[in-house]
Amino acid sequence: MVTENTISSERATPVTFTVPNTTPVTKTPEWQALVAHATQAKGTTIKDLFRDDPGRAGDMTFDAGPLHVDLSKNLADENTLRLLTNVARAMGIENYRQSMFNGEHINTTEDRAVLHTALRIPIEQDMTVDGQDVAEDVHGVLGRMRDLARALRKGDWRGVTNHTIKNVVNIGIGGSDLGPAMAAKALRPYCTAGITPYFVSNVDPSDITSTLDGLDPESTLFVVSSKTFTTSETLANAHAAKRWLLRELGHTGVDVKDDAVVKDAVAKHFVAVSTNAEAVAEFGIDTRNMFGFWDWVGGRYSVDSAIGLSLMAAIGPRDFMEFVGGFHEVDNHFYSEPLEMNVPVLMGLLGVWYTSVLGSQSHLVLPYSDDLADFPSYLQQLMMESNGKSRRLNGDLTTVETGEVYWGAQGTNGQHAFMQLIHQGTHLIPTDFIGFVNPHTDAVASDGETSMHDMLLSNFLAQSRVMAFGRDEDEVREAGVEEELVPHKVMPGNRPSTTIVADKLTPRTLGALIALYEHIAFVQGVVWGINSFDQWGVELGKKQANELLPKLGANNGGADVSTGDSSTDSLTKHILRNRRR
């Protein structure tokens, strides 16, 4: 269930947002003190920090909802964290946080509120944004989602041939796909009602073709997720899905030449997550089966909105509300805890420390759970689309490096792929380890006794330990290694990491984990002075793709394919010359 609310409900209708501090972070005395500290601390190792402070692990471990977070293996001491929180305060983090939760328009380039946190507020909470009762709206949509999910799971929703629905295919892209797809895989043990979710996003036709191959059209429902219902990739896949549905239904005896039958088939096999009722109706979807969301919810922050409809259908309304409750727990923690004990704040500031002070270029995420295999990809959009910016809010260039390149894979696979570079390479790559005390399933290893989950956890603990403390020459020699191999087997250590542990990968835990990184992105954006909630680079790419598309069309008739640059011109001509229609 959604947890008890501790965020203040006494919030006024938002006023025009005023940026708390317009000074570049590098011009603040707090930043200069941080840089001076970095110079002074140069050469200090993680091993030194543990040696000098026996209580370090206890002092730097915190709980945020169901998440137990150990920051002690980072290249930072209490003084570093104090200086970082001073920087955050100087940049107005507390006022910014309040403004976000108040529904003020902190997305300044689009003049919008940023209120993904409102997606998980209790219905009794009083929150009005731009004159609209947010809690009532949110729970109204959740109620309609719940009704549809229950109808699907109970077999009350029937296709045009009266078959129950067994397959739910979500068609979207970006935030309309990555979140629900990741969450559906992460929560596979909770998909118990015979509803199998599928996800189509890529405009590459092989994506939808391979997904639909083998599915029964009579038992398949499509969820078309596009706020504007104009996203080109999503609409291309939606129309391909409609053609497939009608073709395959025709093979079962459905009269797909009868317009009334076609209308009925589309209405019973398609629903929409959108706000464009006219376009939804034009496609053929009954607007009573359209689920909306709001311009104060960015796509990459929308998995717990109607965008999660396919997820709710798969795991059920009760577990979906547990998922939402996990978000809310971390929202409460982020809103109410002092900066010095606030996990999203501290993790976000450590990212600033590594990126903008110590020169790190990327951030590795290693979930030791196969169910969480897609979590690093999800974080790529959340973190990189949010903070991949080089302009401050006033339009000036940033004065520090911003944004972290997120990447990763599930453990232990990553150990046999890229961990060599982490342990003995030359790059500084802070790492987040994510593990779970209890598995959903377990098995024994080849000896017939050892738990495979224990094997997983032993690797989980060992990797962060080797990263932090390494192995010096004396230890290598003590292990009996031949002298000429000693330098090759030295592990320098001093590789920073954060360890996140939860009891089990449940809907609640996953919601908390996502909310943690949502707030990390926010904290970093405030310190860097950028807008974490627009994505103009993505928009320009869409525009130019639409301009290039006619030049690649089958009916271009030898028309001019000039694009304005010789490279794109040459590539376009090469494609046209070698195309086989």
Spans of features found by a protein language model:
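Helicase-primase coupling helices
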Residues: 407-504
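Flexible, glycine-rich loop/tail regions that form catalytic "lids" or insertion modules at the edges
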Residues: 2, 7, 11-92, 345-357, ...
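Extended, charge-enriched "interface" segments that sit outside catalytic cores
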Residues: 19-30, 35-161, 450-452, 457, ...
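Active-site phosphate/pyrophosphate-binding segments
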Residues: 247-443, 493, 540-546, 555-581
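C-terminal accessory domains/tails appended to large, multi-domain proteins
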Residues: 491-495, 499-528, 533, 540, ...
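Short glycine-rich or small-residue beta-strand-to-loop segments that form or flank ligand, phosphate
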Residues: 166-172, 222-228, 362-369, 405-406, ...
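Glycine-rich phosphate-binding loops that contact phosphosugars or nucleotide phosphates
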Residues: 147-155, 162-337
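Conserved active-site and cofactor/substrate-binding residues in soluble primary-metabolism enzymes
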Residues: 29, 55, 75, 79, ...
